[in-house]
């Protein structure tokens, strides 16, 4: 891979940090992290070879300046509290996922960048009723129609040493006598190790998968219940599972939506109970990567936590 300067929006987040490390490991890339708070981002990702630049999606001039001299922009932004929106703080899928992508597209074109890489989601669909799936689908369309070379990744549930979902589930299992599964527990999920996603992003920076959209999940398609049993086996904390009806969860979400910093919402219930399956064959054909089986990845994760 020729030496490049890669700008990364969302570089201090869980997925972004893994991408930064993978790009630096290539030895062929200078990484520039776009962030509202460079000091805070540096504290979370203090690695040699990373440049931190102040930029905000609501300030177009700051984005253009931050992208000057870069070759590629990677959009891996997720808002705080994802997937629970907080409209009072402007943390919505429409503003962050869709409008944020459009702002980065405009800035990239003004700054003369040639390549846009987007971390979308497995259920992205511009016609979806869920605001998150719809916003990501609309962002994808904007990217495809931008005239920039692009690669779009649609991951299923992403996990790793620093994720909040799988690690959070493991922490609950450590102390709770039983575990409440959202919905029926039959919703499909295909957990993908964050390092595998980051490896594909690095290959995309070098030109692989150009102008393509690729779903990415692990090699194992499973139900949420089955994933919980794998997490329990890996952590050594087996607990009885019970299922929380969606109707009850939505009622609780409706109440919590009224709080200044809601921990649950009705849309978040839809998000966690939706199928999150992937067709990974196009990705495997194009990128030739060996995806990590869930039992191996989660056993590795459990060891990292000890």
Describe the residue ranges of each PLM region:
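Mid/C-terminal beta-alpha module of Rossmann-like enzyme folds, strongest
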Residues: 2, 200, 204-264, 278-306
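N-terminal Rossmann NAD(P)H-binding glycine-rich loop of SDR-like oxidoreductase domains
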Residues: 4-26
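SDR active-site strand-loop-helix element
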Residues: 9, 34, 76-77, 116-122, ...
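Residues forming the Rossmann-fold NAD(P)(H) cofactor-binding site
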Residues: 14-18, 98, 137
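Conserved glycine-rich Rossmann-like NAD(P)H-binding loop of the short-chain dehydrogenase/reductase
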Residues: 28-36
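NAD(P)H-binding glycine-rich loop region in Rossmannoid oxidoreductase-like domains
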Residues: 39-111, 122-125
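Substrate-positioning beta->alpha
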Residues: 100, 164-165, 184-205, 211-212
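Conserved beta-loop-beta element that borders a ligand/cofactor-binding pocket
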Residues: 120, 141-164
């Amino acid at each position: 891979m020729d030496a490049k300067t890669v700008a990364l929006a969302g570089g201090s987040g869980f997925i972004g940090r893994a991408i930064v490390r993978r790009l630096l490991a290539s030895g062929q890339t200078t990484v520039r992290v776009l962030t509202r708070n460079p000091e805070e981002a540096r504290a979370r990702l203090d690695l040699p070879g990373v440049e931190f630049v102040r930029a905000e999606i609501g300030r177009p001039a700051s984005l253009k300046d931050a992208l000057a001299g870069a070759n590629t922009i990677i959009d891996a932004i997720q808002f705080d509290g994802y997937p629970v929106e907080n409209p009072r703080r402007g943390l919505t899928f429409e503003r962050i996922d869709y409008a944020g992508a459009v702002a980065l597209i405009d800035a990239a074109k003004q700054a003369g960048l040639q390549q846009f890489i987007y971390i979308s989601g497995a259920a992205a669909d511009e016609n979806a009723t869920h605001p998150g799936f719809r916003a990501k689908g609309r962002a994808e369309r904007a990217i495809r129609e931008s005239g920039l070379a692009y690669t779009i990744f649609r991951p299923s549930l992403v996990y790793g040493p620093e994720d909040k979902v799988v690690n959070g589930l493991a922490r609950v299992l450590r102390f709770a006598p039983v575990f409440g599964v959202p919905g029926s527990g039959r919703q499909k999920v295909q957990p993908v190790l964050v390092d595998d996603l980051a490896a594909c992003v690095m290959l995309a920076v070098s030109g692989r998968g150009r102008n393509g959209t690729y779903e990415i999940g692990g090699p194992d398609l499973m139900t949420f219940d089955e994933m919980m049993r794998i997490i329990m086996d890996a952590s050594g904390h087996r607990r009885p599972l019970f299922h929380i009806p969606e109707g009850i969860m939505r009622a609780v979400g409706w109440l919590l939506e009224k709080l200044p910093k809601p921990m649950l919402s009705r849309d978040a219930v839809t998000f966690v109970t939706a199928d999150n399956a992937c067709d990974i064959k196009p990705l495997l054909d194009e990128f030739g990567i060996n995806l990590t089986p869930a039992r191996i990845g989660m056993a590795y994760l459990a060891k990292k936590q000890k």
